[in-house]
Amino acid sequence: MSLWYIIVAFVFFSSMIIVRIIRKTKKNLPPGPPRLPIIGNLHQLGSKPHRSMFKLSETYGPLMSLKFGSVSTVVASTPETVKEVLKTFDVECCSRPNMTYPARVTYNLKDLCFSPYSKYWREVRKMTVVELYTAKRVQSFQHTRKEEVAALVDFIKQAASLEKPVNLNKKLMKLSGSVICRVAFGINLQGSKLENTYEEVIQGTVELVGSFAAADYFPVVGRIIDRITGLHSKCEKLFKAMDAFFDQSIKHHLEDEIIKDDIIDLLLKMERGETTLGEFQLTRDHTKGILANILNAGIDTSAQVMTWVMTYLISNPRVLKKAQAEVREVIKHKDDIIEEDIERLQYLKMVIKETFRINPLVPLLIPREASKDVKIGGYNIPKKTWIHVNIWAIHRNPNVWKDPEAFIPERFMDSQIDYKGLNFELLPFGSGRRICPGIGMGMALVHLTLINLLYRFDWKLPEGMKVADVDLEESYGLVCPKKIPLQLIPVLTQWT
């Protein structure tokens, strides 16, 4: 009798698989791995989905189908397929799915990063490009960046005189937070509602919005699962901390009679109708939603770029020596280091590009959603399909990059490849309509800080550590930080 049940079960499940294959063939969907009932391919993601998807793409191709619970997904993993998604069919593929926790922390999708493609999104995008992140505005905040970098240099000098290690993760996060608080919110990080929790709130939020939440994939029971796992309560805690900070910043602006020229001031003018946002009247939630993007993306991305650059430099002594020699030759004994000095530092620019390549800031771009049926790479992508762009896979692909696991800045020598979204071999900030609008603002701080760190100090590992001991593993989130903090000992030099 038991044998009979086994035969029936075998025939039943075999029939299901055959039917699925036939249906899939008729739909002409991209190939993909077999799925489990209910959960689909979620079990194959692991703790680092960008790496898992890259591994799967080596078997199933540059455009593959996955199923996450009830959500149909495709993953693009090569420059060719990604170019189709981000350029050829940018309009059809640039909307966003409604994701539970990003919606919560952006005041119901009133932001730029997570809101769907719409007239409102186009107006906010236009406002950020024309008003917030212009070259003129970036330049206007140079004095603030110089002051905060000078404060960091003073701290490192004290640590160097005592031969004490510096936690660069923490110090660079604080630097970035201090700059963003001043240029965007008009207040100092020290003394603000986020003074003691900014690191937890920023990194927690970035990790939260990059997570694969049950509520997004299981409409009926997902929210219950997230309450059991604690994801829901974590979201509420982070949201309340951010909201209190925004209230404090806005109150400060409303009570201060001194006219400011920062980002909150512009948004408050739009609330009052003094400046327009097309046909839309901004509410307080719109203001906070836009500020949420600036706070989280602005602080975390710049800090992580600088941390990863210093990580790869200390783990590659040859590269560190070459980069420092260039910086010291160009800067010489000039006290007034400026951001524009980066234009004469060709090797340092190569180091930054190589860091973007080997550790892209956002290894999986924020999911997109097809707004209509579209054909990509010869396959049909139905409307409402989620589209993941795996930047990690492109940057580590041996068919795209020679020796992709090695850190070799010289690969960019005499190369026109840049990171501004036009070269699909290197896309740390994305491309197309959804490209990060704050590249100029973030990179200005990155350049100024790295030049100072390399010019003024030598760096060595803590006692007992060797170069081989430097950990290069990333944690997973929307932005992938270094898993183990980078501790380095600064050394005073004649340039300090």
Curated annotation (Swiss-Prot):
It is found in: Membrane. Its cofactor is heme. The chain crosses the membrane at residues 2-22. Its EC number is 1.14.-.-. Heme binds at residue 436. It holds the Pfam family p450. One of its GO terms (cellular component) is membrane. It is a single-pass membrane protein. SUPFAM superfamilies: Cytochrome P450. Keywords: Heme, Iron, Membrane, Metal-binding, Monooxygenase, Oxidoreductase, Transmembrane, Transmembrane helix. GO terms for molecular function: heme binding; iron ion binding; monooxygenase activity; oxidoreductase activity, acting on paired donors, with incorporation or reduction of molecular oxygen. InterPro entries: Cyt_P450, Cyt_P450_CS, Cyt_P450_E_grp-I, Cyt_P450_sf. The keyword Iron applies. Belongs to the cytochrome P450 family. This is Cytochrome P450 71B12. It comes from Arabidopsis thaliana (Mouse-ear cress).
